[in-house]
Amino acid sequence: MEVPGDRFYTKTHEWVKISENRAIIGITSYAIEQLGDITFLEVKPKGTLIKKGEVLGVVESSKTTEKIYAPVSGEIVEINRDCGVVEEGSSEVPIGLEKIVEDPYEEGWIVVLEVKGDLSSELRDLMSSEDYLKHLKEGH
């Protein structure tokens, strides 16, 4: 299972990659494997301020519907529409969701947040790739 070492992970299977004060967020390959075919992915609108742990969006699949949680606090500044991610309340038709499945850690990112808090405290309780792999081996 692919778990890149250049980002942080949550117990709910989101990943975050930090680039200066920006946080690129997606879901892990493990989450995708558990979900099955992704049919819809909706996130809060651009400009929304969101706190760490709050619901960022929802992903629907052939098996279930799951919430996506914000691993850090910030303002949504970018939404990956190229991968079929749509804004909450939008009438857009999702096109390109397969990119999230095929390349969840690069092309398949979901949103970018501009981090609004102290970055080190925002990252404090997130897992490294090694810790995330241990978490998965423990059956989570």
Curated annotation (Swiss-Prot):
The modification N6-lipoyllysine is found at K63. GO terms for cellular component: glycine cleavage complex. Disulfide bonds: none annotated. PROSITE patterns: BIOTINYL_LIPOYL, LIPOYL. Signal peptide: none annotated. It holds the Pfam family GCV_H. Binds 1 lipoyl cofactor covalently. Residues 22-114 form the Lipoyl-binding domain. GO terms for biological process: glycine decarboxylation via glycine cleavage system. InterPro entries: 2-oxoA_DH_lipoyl-BS, Biotin_lipoyl, GCV_H, GCV_H/Fam206, Single_hybrid_motif. Its cofactor is (R)-lipoate. Keywords: Lipoyl. Belongs to the GcvH family. The glycine cleavage system is composed of four proteins: P, T, L and H. The glycine cleavage system catalyzes the degradation of glycine. The H protein shuttles the methylamine group of glycine from the P protein to the T protein. This is Probable glycine cleavage system H protein. It comes from Korarchaeum cryptofilum (strain OPF8).
